[in-house]
């Protein structure tokens, strides 16, 4: 700090160099209270939302709280997660409630500042992760005058609205694609130029089904060829057992029945069933993936302790498949829909990056409004 040149209008503090008018303050001094919620009951027909560690978790016929508050998940895997509540509501006992002193601290500014702080770094406990009100009260933050807080919150709010709008667009595109899949893959909607009947086949007649060799977890690394298991990508390995992309179904564990499309040159473990159509020239692999992912394998899951799908029932699983040209045309339509969703997701991530960069500048006073 002694070797730093402090710009005009700034000052040195324990948190670094901040604008002269800003003050380093404890969250406890900026809040009227920080305490746990009290609700432990739900009412299916209640009118008041009950907030928990993941947002609204139910409803109640009565409410304990009223007005704006910031909520922080207190315990469990979501400890440190933020939410905002207003109106009349209730809060579960696994959630901390921060009531702000609105004459010195703007709620929207505070929410952004706590988001930027990343509260999950305060979480402790290996068995049951936890964050306490005392920890929150001791958080020190650089705080500008109230008018500047509101201006900063207003600017960040523009990005919030853009992010929310883009997220809604992605939801709409996903719903549209899902509806399109259901109609195209059931032949309820036929593309122009196609009218031939679809054939009913068994999965074992069009694909080779097998579970590859499983590798040990200690053999996985951070580099090499991707390895796909029961939960999708699980690591990397120095070799691959499939040169071309493959359609796979998770056949063990809680995600049993989940369909994935692996890339070429990857290792697929024995926790996944490969549906290999490489040697079937009458099947378009992209179409096959969409068809399988639109199918339900719930009725094939067996085992009470460890859910699993075994090969024999899968071999007999019935599908309806159109001629190859129609398969290709359908795959092209659905691939275009996927690409549209991917582009929308890329834009959403750009907006989020822009907001994070803006927060870094505005919430530290490096950039003034």
Predicted segment positions?
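Amphipathic alpha-helical coiled-coil/heptad-repeat segments
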Residues: 1-21, 142-199, 320-369
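Non-catalytic DNA-recognition/assembly elements of restriction-modification systems
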Residues: 8-37, 45-51, 146, 192-213, ...
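Structural detector for helix-capping/boundary residues
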Residues: 13, 25, 54, 117, ...
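Short clusters of hydrophobic/aromatic residues that line enzyme substrate/ligand-binding pockets
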Residues: 15, 82, 89, 119, ...
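Proline-centric
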Residues: 16-21, 96-106, 119-121, 134-153, ...
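A short beta-sheet element
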Residues: 52-115, 124-127, 132-136, 229-293, ...
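The feature marks the first
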Residues: 121-124, 178-179, 299-302
């Amino acid at each position: 700090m002694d070797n730093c040149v402090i710009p005009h209008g700034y000052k040195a503090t324990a948190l670094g160099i901040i604008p002269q008018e800003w003050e380093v303050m404890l969250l406890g001094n900026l809040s009227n209270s920080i305490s746990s919620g009290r609700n432990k009951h739900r009412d299916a027909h209640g009118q008041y939302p009950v907030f928990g560690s993941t947002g609204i978790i139910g409803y109640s016929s009565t409410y304990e709280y009223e007005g704006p508050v910031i909520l922080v998940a207190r315990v469990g895997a979501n400890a440190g997660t933020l939410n905002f509540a207003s109106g009349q509501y209730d809060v579960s006992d696994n959630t901390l409630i921060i009531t702000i002193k609105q004459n010195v601290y703007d709620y929207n500014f505070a929410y952004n500042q706590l988001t930027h702080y990343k509260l999950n770094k305060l979480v402790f406990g290996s068995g049951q992760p936890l964050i306490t009100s005392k920890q929150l009260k001791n958080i020190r933050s650089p705080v500008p005058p109230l008018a500047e807080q509101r201006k900063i919150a207003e600017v960040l709010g523009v990005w919030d609205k853009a992010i929310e709008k883009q997220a809604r667009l992605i939801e709409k595109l996903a719903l549209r694609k899902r509806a399109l899949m259901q109609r195209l893959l059931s032949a309820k909607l036929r593309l122009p130029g196609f009218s031939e009947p679809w054939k009913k086949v068994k999965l074992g007649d069009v694909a080779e089904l097998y579970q590859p060799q499983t590798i040990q977890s200690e053999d996985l690394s951070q580099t090499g060829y991707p390895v796909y298991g029961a939960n999708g990508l699980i690591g990397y390995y120095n070799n691959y057992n499939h040169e071309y992309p493959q359609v796979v179904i998770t056949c063990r564990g809680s995600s049993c029945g989940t369909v994935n499309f692996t890339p070429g040159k990857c290792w697929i473990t024995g926790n996944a069933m490969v549906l290999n159509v490489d040697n079937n020239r009458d099947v378009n692999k992209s179409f096959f993936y969409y068809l399988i992912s639109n199918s339900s394998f719930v009725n094939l899951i067996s085992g009470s302790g460890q859910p699993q799908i075994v090969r024999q029932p899968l071999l007999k699983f019935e599908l309806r498949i159109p001629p190859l040209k129609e398969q290709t045309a359908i795959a092209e339509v659905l691939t275009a829909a996927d690409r549209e969703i991917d582009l929308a997701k890329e834009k959403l991530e750009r907006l989020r990056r822009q907001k994070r960069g803006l927060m870094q500048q505005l919430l530290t006073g490096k950039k003034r409004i």
